[in-house]
Design a protein with these regions (language model features):
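A residue-level signal for beta-strand positions that form part of recognition/binding surfaces
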Residues: 14, 59, 107
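A short glycine/serine-rich beta->alpha loop
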Residues: 75-79, 112-121
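A short, contiguous, amphipathic alpha-helix enriched in charged residues
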Residues: 2-10, 84-85, 129, 133
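Glycine- and Gly-Pro-enriched alpha-helical subdomains that act as flexible
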Residues: 118-133
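Short, structured loop/turn "capping" segments at alpha-beta junctions
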Residues: 100-108, 121-123
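Conserved beta-strand segments that form the floor/walls of ligand-binding pockets within enzyme
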Residues: 61, 109-113
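Glycine-rich, flexible beta-strand/loop modules in the N-terminal catalytic cores of phosphate-handling
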Residues: 21, 26-103
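Short, Gly/Pro- and small/polar-rich lid/capping loops
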Residues: 1-25, 29-32
Length: 133
């Protein structure tokens, strides 16, 4: 059975990955899966949250947002339950594969911004974040 966009049920969306998309960010990726596009940056700061101070481990945190023009109807700026859930999921997913002990007292800040939403934004953001880190 074909989907609305013409793909077969087992066919993936075309994927493109453009690393180094933002010159001022040590890790940046423009990730596209079909018409969905997510821009992710990863940057370091020499600090950790208070609960980790003095423990010799680092941290990874994530933020996720959908730009107002990313959906057919204008998406309001600001936090909402879905965005909060997704940014926590991104953080947890990456902390599961990043050796925070090797970071020392540093934090990796991941920012994921959906610039065009056409389905699969959560998985696109997680994948792009992994590439950016």
């Amino acid at each position: 059975m074909a989907r609305v966009d013409g793909r077969e049920s087992g066919e993936l969306r075309p994927i493109t990955i453009e690393r180094g998309f933002i010159a001022n960010s040590p890790g940046s990726v423009l990730f596209r899966a079909g018409a969905t596009a997510v821009l992710v940056t990863a940057q370091l700061s020499e600090s950790v949250p208070p609960f980790l101070e003095g423990k010799g481990v680092g941290w990874l945190t994530a933020e996720y947002a959908m730009l107002p023009g990313s959906t057919p109807g204008r998406k309001r700026r600001g936090p909402d339950g879905r965005a909060t859930e997704i940014q926590r999921l991104i953080g947890r997913s990456l902390r599961a594969v990043v050796d925070t002990r090797a970071l020392g007292p540093w934090t990796i800040h991941v920012d994921a911004d959906v610039i065009n939403a056409d389905g699969g934004t959560r998985t696109a953001a997680i994948t792009a974040a992994f590439i950016a880190v």
